[in-house]
């Protein structure tokens, strides 16, 4: 209702406006060559405005035609960028759900645009984690080293890759960079530990293993134990028996030991009493029971086989470790 009223008022205003203009309008004579055109001032103004608008439309149309190739190029470029972005997201999704081969295929086949900007980092990430050879991985991770989002992940992986290539100095540098960004990443600590061991930087090695002990990474205990045994043997070769004993005691305090390390420690440290050796062995057996420790227990103590059996099996679960208990009985001939 209101709109209808507004339209009526508008038409009335136009009618009275034109009537008013016509009342005061004056004649105008336009001379063009030998012709005299008689018109009114109002009509002349209207025709002038129409001519101006027509010229503007024609000029605008010509500009559009001239810019048409560039407009088409921009349109297709945007379409390609959107396609590439979609492909990056799709490749990333495939990688997350474990389809690494499909993610790699999408990344290599569909993505080539340099205009992806932020998405280029995700592109390089997919290419880095799915590349098959070490050099390609290193190349892609190097591109991510300046990315705030991926700098830690790139540094951590570059450390591993350079370690695999036996470039321990470079591996150490990248592992330290990753460590400065995140001190609690156990995988990076393990890489750093390996680097220090290969470079014989034992004080730094011990600092890292002290941190690793807090993570209870049982799968790496044998390797760490071997490193401590290696340090001790090197010290013995250099006639530094006291240092060797000190390293072995550090390993035992951190629960990094096996039967070989314990036997080497017992033979090296003649100040240990039988009770001290027994206590260490019982703790080692509680953490990682093995027949080799039973053998070592029998070797260093004067207890009977029955007493050894009772001492050691009391820390075992009779149901869970039933087979192992039977193996101990067989070894001790009980």
Curated annotation (Swiss-Prot):
The chain crosses the membrane at residues 1-21, 46-66. Keywords: Cell membrane, Membrane, Transmembrane, Transmembrane helix. GO terms for cellular component: plasma membrane. Pfam families: HemY_N (PF07219). It comes from the Bacteria. InterPro entries: HemY_N, TPR-like_helical_dom_sf. Its main location: membrane. It is found in: Cell membrane. It is a multi-pass membrane protein. This is Uncharacterized protein RP472. It comes from Rickettsia prowazekii (strain Madrid E).
């Amino acid at each position: 209702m209101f709109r209808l009223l507004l339209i009526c008022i508008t038409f009335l205003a136009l009618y009275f406006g034109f009537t008013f203009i016509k009342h005061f309008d004056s004649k105008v004579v336009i001379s063009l060559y030998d012709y005299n055109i008689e018109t009114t001032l109002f009509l002349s103004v209207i025709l002038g405005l129409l001519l101006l608008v027509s010229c503007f439309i024609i000029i605008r149309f010509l500009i559009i035609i001239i810019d048409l190739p560039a407009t088409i190029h921009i349109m297709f470029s945007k379409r390609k960028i959107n396609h590439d972005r979609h492909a990056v997201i799709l490749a990333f999704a495939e990688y997350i759900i474990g389809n690494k081969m499909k993610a790699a295929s999408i990344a290599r086949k569909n993505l080539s645009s340099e205009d992806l900007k932020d998405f280029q980092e995700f592109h390089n990430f997919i290419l880095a984690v799915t590349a098959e050879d070490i050099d390609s991985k290193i190349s892609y991770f190097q591109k991510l080293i300046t990315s705030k989002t991926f700098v830690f992940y790139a540094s951590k992986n570059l450390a591993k890759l350079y370690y695999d290539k036996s470039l321990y100095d470079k591996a150490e540098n990248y592992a330290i960079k990753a460590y400065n960004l995140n001190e609690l990443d156990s995988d990076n600590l393990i890489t750093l530990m390996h680097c220090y061991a290969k470079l014989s930087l034992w004080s730094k090695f011990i600092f890292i293993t002290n941190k690793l002990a807090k993570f209870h990474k049982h799968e790496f205990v044998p390797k760490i134990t071997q490193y401590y045994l290696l340090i001790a043997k090197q010290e013995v070769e250099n006639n530094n028996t006291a240092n060797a004993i000190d390293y072995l005691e550090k390993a035992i305090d951190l629960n990094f030991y096996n039967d070989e390390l314990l036997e080497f420690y017992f033979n090296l440290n003649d100040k240990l009493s039988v009770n001290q050796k027994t206590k260490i062995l019982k703790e080692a057996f509680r953490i990682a029971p093995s027949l080799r420790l039973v053998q070592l227990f029998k070797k260093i103590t004067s207890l009977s086989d029955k007493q050894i059996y009772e001492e050691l099996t009391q820390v075992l679960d009779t149901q869970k470790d039933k087979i192992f208990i039977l193996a101990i009985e067989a070894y001790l001939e009980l």
